[in-house]
Amino acid sequence: MTTMDTQQRIKQQVESHPVVLFMKGTPQFPQCGFSALAVQVLNACGVKEFATVNVLADAEIREGIKQYANWPTIPQLYVNGEFVGGSDIVREMYESGELQKLLEQTSQKA
C-alpha cells in the first residue's frame, strides 16, 4: 500500500512537467523493452525534453504509480497532466498520428 505522500509526489511530478514518462531505467539506459519503446516513440515525435521517473529507483513510486492511474504496467506516459497510456497505447497512438497531435499541444515540441 502506498502512502498519500507517495501519491502527492507522483501528482507533483505529473503536474510539474508537460510530458512525463514513468519508466524502468533511464532514457539512455532503459531497463525493459517497453520503456525503451516509449522513449523511442517520444524521440520519433520530436519531443525535445520530457521528464522521466525511474521507478526502479523507488519502490513506493513503482507501486504508487500503478494506483495513481489505476494502470497495472510500466511505462506510463502523462501529457499535460493526463494519463495517456502504456507502451502499447503510446505505440498505437503514434502509428495513428494521435500522439503527435497531443504532443503538439505542449511547449516541448519544436
Cite the ranges covered by each PLM segment.
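N-terminal leader/targeting and pre-domain segments
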Residues: 1-20, 110
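Thiol-based oxidoreductase modules, predominantly thioredoxin-like and allied folds used
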Residues: 47-62
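Acidic beta-strand-to-loop metal/phosphate-binding motif
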Residues: 22, 76-80
